[in-house]
């Protein structure tokens, strides 16, 4: 890669700055990263993209822990959630340690997809990946759990020495008062107080 030495230098400096100012750096690779896919070329491309994220974090000298998380949705259900989650766990083993040590998974915003409960029993119990609780997504894919129950289940998957990460957003439809906007779309601003239920997150 052209200018790789200069790139490494800037990334290393950025990593030092993040630690100096106590900034927690994380990433959220795009939705095309689908480790549940039954198509080998999709999985290969996913592994390549996630590896790039892990390499960048390594060049920044960030911790190989979920403190510096690389967070993804696990991908499609393909009509069989259980088989898809099993595939995800198998394909997880294709990832380098720079990714496996940082990878987290997040609950989805469609009822047909993955709730915190799905991820807990189908992924976390198999391979120990922490779950990032998304408050807004939970409204559309609750897994028959209350917000507090799902939050606390997700929190329980994190190492005890790392503050769990969560995602919080609100509905753009409500913010813009526009019924044509997908209710799952994120608002530009936060208006309500975030209920942590007494947890440090």
Map each language-model feature to its residues:
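Short acidic, Gly/Ser-rich segments with clustered Asp/Glu that frequently serve as metal-coordination loops
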Residues: 111, 136-142
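A generic structural signal for short coil/turn motifs at secondary-structure boundaries
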Residues: 35-36, 79-81, 140-143, 176-177
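Active-site acidic/histidine proton-transfer and metal-coordination neighborhood
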Residues: 3-130
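Histidine-acidic metal/acid-base catalytic patches
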Residues: 129, 141-201
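Active-site proximal loops enriched in glycine and acidic residues that flank catalytic Cys/His/Asp
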Residues: 107, 133-135, 168-170
């Amino acid at each position: 890669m052209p200018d790789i030495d200069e790139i490494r230098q800037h990334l290393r400096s950025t990593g030092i700055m993040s630690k100096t100012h106590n900034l927690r750096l994380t990433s959220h690779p795009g939705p095309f990263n689908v480790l549940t896919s039954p198509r080998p070329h999709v999985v290969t491309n996913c592994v390549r993209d996630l590896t790039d994220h892990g390499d960048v974090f390594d060049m920044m000298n960030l911790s190989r822990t979920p403190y510096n998380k690389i967070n993804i949705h696990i991908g499609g259900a393909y009509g069989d959630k259980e088989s898809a989650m099993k595939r995800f766990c198998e394909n997880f083993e294709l990832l380098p340690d720079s990714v496996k040590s940082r990878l987290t998974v997040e609950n989805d915003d469609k009822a047909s997809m993955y709730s915190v409960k799905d991820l807990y029993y189908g992924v976390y119990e198999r391979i120990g990946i922490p779950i990032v609780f998304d408050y807004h997504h939970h409204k559309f894919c609750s897994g028959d759990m209350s917000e507090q129950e799902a939050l606390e289940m997700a929190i329980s998957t994190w190492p005890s020495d790392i503050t769990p990460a969560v995602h919080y957003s609100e509905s753009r439809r409500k913010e813009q008062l526009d019924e044509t906007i997908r209710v799952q779309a994120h608002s530009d601003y936060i208006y309500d107080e975030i209920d942590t239920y007494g947890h440090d997150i």
